[in-house]
Amino acid sequence: MHISVLLEEAVDALNIQKGGIYVDGTYGRGGHSRLILSRLDKSGQLIAFDKDPAAISEARSILDERFQAVHSSYAGMYTALQSLGINRVDGILLDLGVSSIQLDEASRGFSFRHDGPLDMRMDSSRGKTAAEWLTMASETELKEIIRTYGEERYAGQIASAIVMEQARQPISTTLRLAEIVAAVVRKRGHRDDRQHPATRTFQAIRIHLNQELEELSMTLPQCVELLNTGGRLVVISFHSLEDRIVKRFMRMQTGTDTLPRRLPIREEESRLHNQQKLRIIGKKIRPGSDEVSANPRARSAVMRVAEKLETRNAISR
């Protein structure tokens, strides 16, 4: 069962206006979407995106004229909303990463605990599977991807072992890949009872295969463009690579890093100088101990919130 992380906190952070237009960029299994809908009146709208066909199939079971489900990555959000006649929205939620259902269904090929075909595609209707990609990946490419996207200290040794085993017999199942990786990590004497030895390698291959970081980087500017003044952008990330992108983007959009401190200029002049488009709302939020106890996968979640500012073309004096 998929449990939405930071459910109340995320929807509260959107600061829902009853008649507003909202976007759930990652429908998953609809926890956030259903709560958003419960806070809208009859004139409100919610558009949900997901590139997983199974998620969209579930979303289309919601029979509510205020709700539309779009089979697309959130990276296609701007174009899709334009085609629906929507130019501006009042809030956008991005709940990044993989859903519990995707992880737990062996047939989806994300799990290093349950045996299944080595797939790992978020959108199972297109693109190469992880097994197909491994047949073409060089050791150098594998090492770079595992090191960059998995932040795995044994990337070189893992890549070498994968290529060696691949030459012996193509790796086509999740447990075989997990066993190859785990053998390398354990041989190095590294042990972390909180994390499976293959976690970082599986994360790296999944991120690369689904272009997760590229899509996130493409999507964040679209969100700023789409938001009405006062609209909120809420992003929940699950690993440091995602969170760094979100944090850096939000800080850049505040413009606070580009002027020397203590300059004697008015706030509105500073904002115009830096083309400030967002203001950060509060500090990052993590799940509480009760939520982590109930849903251990929530432990790495980080939520950041920003609000769209009014843009000005000139400074009034």
From Swiss-Prot:
<dbReference type="GO" id="GO:0070475">
    <property type="term" value="P:rRNA base methylation"/>
</dbReference>
<keyword id="KW-0963">Cytoplasm</keyword>
<keyword id="KW-0698">rRNA processing</keyword>
<dbReference type="Pfam" id="PF01795">
    <property type="entry name" value="Methyltransf_5"/>
</dbReference>
<comment type="function">
    <text>Specifically methylates the N4 position of cytidine in position 1402 (C1402) of 16S rRNA.</text>
</comment>
<feature type="binding site">
    <location>
        <position position="50"/>
    </location>
    <ligand>
        <name>S-adenosyl-L-methionine</name>
    </ligand>
</feature>
<feature type="binding site">
    <location>
        <position position="95"/>
    </location>
    <ligand>
        <name>S-adenosyl-L-methionine</name>
    </ligand>
</feature>
<feature type="binding site">
    <location>
        <position position="78"/>
    </location>
    <ligand>
        <name>S-adenosyl-L-methionine</name>
    </ligand>
</feature>
<feature type="binding site">
    <location>
        <position position="102"/>
    </location>
    <ligand>
        <name>S-adenosyl-L-methionine</name>
    </ligand>
</feature>
<dbReference type="GO" id="GO:0071424">
    <property type="term" value="F:rRNA (cytosine-N4-)-methyltransferase activity"/>
</dbReference>
<keyword id="KW-0949">S-adenosyl-L-methionine</keyword>
<protein>
    <recommendedName>
        <fullName>Ribosomal RNA small subunit methyltransferase H</fullName>
        <ecNumber>2.1.1.199</ecNumber>
    </recommendedName>
</protein>
<dbReference type="InterPro" id="IPR029063">
    <property type="entry name" value="SAM-dependent_MTases_sf"/>
</dbReference>
<dbReference type="GO" id="GO:0005737">
    <property type="term" value="C:cytoplasm"/>
</dbReference>
<comment type="similarity">
    <text>Belongs to the methyltransferase superfamily. RsmH family.</text>
</comment>
<feature type="binding site">
    <location>
        <begin position="30"/>
        <end position="32"/>
    </location>
    <ligand>
        <name>S-adenosyl-L-methionine</name>
    </ligand>
</feature>
<dbReference type="InterPro" id="IPR002903">
    <property type="entry name" value="RsmH"/>
</dbReference>
<keyword id="KW-0489">Methyltransferase</keyword>
<dbReference type="InterPro" id="IPR023397">
    <property type="entry name" value="SAM-dep_MeTrfase_MraW_recog"/>
</dbReference>
<keyword id="KW-0808">Transferase</keyword>
